[in-house]
A protein has these predicted regions:
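Gly/Ser/Thr-rich beta-alpha loop segments that engage phosphate groups in nucleotides
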Residues: 12-14, 56, 178
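Short SAM/SAH-binding signature in class I
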Residues: 5, 126, 169-170
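Beta1/beta-strand and adjacent pyrophosphate-binding region of the FAD-binding site
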Residues: 2-12
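Dinucleotide-binding/catalytic capping subdomain of oxidoreductase cores
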Residues: 16, 20-162, 196-197
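FAD-site-proximal beta/loop scaffold in flavoenzymes
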Residues: 1, 135, 140, 152-208
Length: 208
């Protein structure tokens, strides 16, 4: 963690977990089960900027309100959201209650005064409508090439044709994983997971 800028790819709770871990002071880890040698590395981290990339917008996040709201209470970090990325507030009424509450947090982050941000050592930046297309560098990560996205009429993410780069020293992927299939067990190949209904695959067979 000797670089200034870390990029996190993903718009779910795992991305938030990573951002929080990189941002917390040693005291904020009191009571956790994190190992001491990891705390030593985090305590001496040079990270000042954390950018969370999401290929869709604020209304499509998979971040729960509690986890998102915790970003506003970090001792040495503050979240940053571009007002221009936020949809019209009237559209929030159409959202499921949990997502609506999460979007409310994003609106609160966008309203944080710059004077308050100046007192924080770390900035957690939400970059919506942004899809990484390449990680570049000479033998190490030096930058990420990002494509600007927009939503079509079906809320699918499509490219605008614009691109830009973010200088960084680390990229962390938080976009989920694909479960390997098992012979004889129903599997959804398009989604990379076992076919299930509320965790039940077959009578007597469950997944978590």
């Amino acid at each position: 963690l000797d670089g200034r800028h870390v990029v996190i790819v993903g718009n779910g709770n795992v991305a938030l977990d990573v951002a929080r871990i990189l941002s917390k002071t040693r005291a904020e880890f009191d009571g956790s089960d994190i190992v001491s040698h990891a705390l030593d590395v985090l305590e001496h981290s040079a990270v000042e900027d954390i950018t969370i990339l999401g290929r869709r917008g604020p209304h499509q996040i998979a971040m729960t309100p509690k986890e998102l709201g915790e970003l506003a209470h970090l001792q040495r970090a503050t979240p940053r959201v571009d007002r221009d990325d936020l949809p019209d507030i009237g559209e929030d009424a159409l959202l499921e209650p949990g997502i609506r509450k999460s979007v409310t947090h994003l609106r609160e982050f966008a309203a944080i005064p710059e004077a308050f941000r100046a007192d924080k050592a770390i900035s957690i930046n939400f970059d919506f409508f942004a899809a990484p297309v390449a990680i570049e560098g000479d033998g190490k990560v030096q930058r990420v090439r990002v494509e600007r996205m927009r939503l079509d009429d079906q809320y699918r993410s499509i490219s605008t044709g614009e691109s830009y780069t973010i200088d960084c020293s680390m990229v962390i992927s938080c976009i989920g994983y694909q479960t390997p299939s098992i012979d004889g067990v129903p599997y959804e190949h398009g989604r990379g997971r076992f076919a299930n209904l509320d965790g039940r695959i077959l009578p007597g067979l469950y997944c978590v």
